[in-house]
Amino acid sequence: MKKILIVGAGGQIGSELVPHLRSIYGNNNVVAADISADKCKALAEAGPFEALNALDGEAYTAIVKKYGIDTIFNLVALLSATGEKNPKLAWDINIGALTNSLYIAKDNNCAVFTPSSIGAFGNDTPKDKTPQDTLQRSNTTI
């Protein structure tokens, strides 16, 4: 049976994905983790939950080992509007969490999934019938 860790579980995608995966794999096989325990009360009541700052590699690794995780979903991201106001903070959080996820997955033989970001696109990207291979000039990168 898969043992899944969803980091950034309290966000827009994670809050929907955790209950769905728990319905498939069982509540105890899907661990939700987020920096904010307050916004994850429903997730914590339904199955395992860990408060985690994904930039803390030691704490992140400890959770992977504690639950015997074999699959990591990295959903950690600063919202685009916040990132536009503070691009360095967005870089530190988004890339830092991704880097930790990749190294921890490699070191613990885990599969890893991390989605792309709408923030990869900018004002010059075509808004209608956007091609698969298109211009990417983010407004939220340094």
Where are these regions (language model features)?
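Residues at the starts of beta-strands that form the adenosine-phosphate
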Residues: K3, N28-N29, A111
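N-terminal Rossmann NAD(P)H-binding glycine-rich loop of SDR-like oxidoreductase domains
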Residues: K3-I24
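SDR active-site strand-loop-helix element
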Residues: V7, A33, I72-V76, V112-I118
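Conserved glycine-rich Rossmann-like NAD(P)H-binding loop of the short-chain dehydrogenase/reductase
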Residues: G26-A37
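Rossmann-fold cofactor-recognition segment
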Residues: A44-D56
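NAD(P)H-binding glycine-rich loop region in Rossmannoid oxidoreductase-like domains
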Residues: A54-I93, G122-N123
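Conserved Rossmann-fold NAD(P)-dependent oxidoreductase catalytic core, especially the SDR/UDP-sugar
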Residues: T99-T140
